[in-house]
Amino acid sequence: MTLEQLQTRLHWVLRITAACCFIGHGAWGVITKEGWLPFFRSQGIPDDIAWKLMPIIGALDIIMAILLLMKPRRIIIMWMLIWALWTAILRPISGTPGTWEFWERAGNFLPPLMLLILGGAIAMKWKDWFSGYTEPKMDDDKIGVLHFICRLTIALLLIGHGGFGAFVEKGMLINHFSSIGIPADVGFINAVGWFEIILGVVVFALPILPIIWFVFAWKVITEFLYVTEGGIINIFEFIERWGDYGVPIALILIINYQTRQSATKAVPEAQAD
């Protein structure tokens, strides 16, 4: 894989990932979701107004996703970063146990951050925020930064989700596994939760391809349990968590590139010896 190929693939993986997160989240706003009411209440917004705001928020999310795919601007990506971060922060603010849901949402707010880093957001002028966002030029420094953020993202979302089973003991998880015939109970989801927490630490400390591929498969399967348990309408829960699948793919691309680069450099050195 050449640097140019990595650049293009990584760029599109992250764009599609961020867009899917917003499409899935936005769809629930358009449909309206009772589970959102505590978020509005935490900001002093009464339920009757919250129900009316949900479709507006949902439609805006979907519009941002379409713009990111069709006509991206850095200001749109910055909005997506801020909004995804805020909706993640709302979860502990609204009374969900601990901060596990915030960390589990790392796959929503860190992909936009990676897109901004790719596009040189730190060194931009004000007018650049509104200009077209073309495919960024990669270099070794950016590759290293993205490698770290991908590892961090995967670790956080695994540890956050693991906390649901290990500490919060969410009944939802029991229902998920029961939907595919696994006789799950509190002890079972405790064990799965600790497994995910340990897996998150391992990914951060030892990001090797077999482990990352396992994480990708694990997240696709376990997040699809929303659909097996709740029906096809919950496909939007699966789509909303696209960061759980897209970020491992991004890390796999980076590791493959770095491995091939190391092998290419090693050949001339061996010949010189």
Regions found by a protein language model. Name each.
Residues L37-W51, H176-V186:
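Perimembrane loop-to-helix junctions flanking transmembrane segments
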